Amino acid sequence: MNSAKLIDHTLLKPESTRTQIDQIIDEAKAYHFKSVCVNPTHVKYAAERLADSEVLVCTVIGFPLGASTTATKAFETEDAIQNGADEIDMVINIGALKDGRFDDVQQDIEAVVKAAKGHTVKVIIETVLLDHDEIVKASELTKAAGADFVKTSTGFAGGGATAEDVKLMKDTVGADIEVKASGGVRNLEDFNKMVEAGATRIGASAGVQIMQGLEADSDY
């Protein structure tokens, strides 16, 4: 397993500067991470800087609340793809899920999948705000909507991924789609727990620390 290829090297802070974006791009190229995940305003720049690299550009849609209208999310997705995004991480309509308006949740995801035109779509369900049954339902809706991944967290809601939630999500979706763990994955121990639970992608701002931990691990 090439652990670096599981990592979306992430910088989504609102105060992110061009200098900081340059840093994560350089790190992603050096460590051969799967992608850099940046806010939409940085997509075009990141795509230009990574044009000669295997590192993909990932961005976020309806982020971090998921409370944008479906039309807005679809437009944001089209704009991001036009600017060079390879992968889309969207946030579901969490309130609609809690209301039991499952058709609305699924249609919201489907609109982004359609707008992404074949590009990878990961669906953030914000597990810290959901109970067991809601996590199961959100995962089922993500699968039914044709997305590629179900993802735990934005990292902006006061909690992140847990191995228990990742396992529940993976058990729910099976082999049909993948699971991304994000939020609070800060070191090699966290990384290993998420992978063992079934995650095949890790979103982390600590990608370098994780890789340094792997290099220091005598079993690696």
Swiss-Prot record:
Task of the protein: Catalyzes a reversible aldol reaction between acetaldehyde and D-glyceraldehyde 3-phosphate to generate 2-deoxy-D-ribose 5-phosphate.
Source organism per UniProt: Staphylococcus aureus (strain COL)
Protein name: Deoxyribose-phosphate aldolase 2
Protein origin, superkingdom: Bacteria
Gene Ontology CC terms: cytoplasm
Lineage, highest ranks first: Bacteria, Bacillati, Bacillota, Bacilli, Bacillales
Catalytic residues in the record: 89, 151, 180
Pfam families: DeoC
E.C. number: 4.1.2.4
Pathway per the UniProt entry: Carbohydrate degradation; 2-deoxy-D-ribose 1-phosphate degradation; D-glyceraldehyde 3-phosphate and acetaldehyde from 2-deoxy-alpha-D-ribose 1-phosphate: step 2/2
Compartments it resides in: Cytoplasm
UniProt gene name: deoC2
UniProt entry keywords in alphabetical sequence: Cytoplasm, Lyase, Schiff base
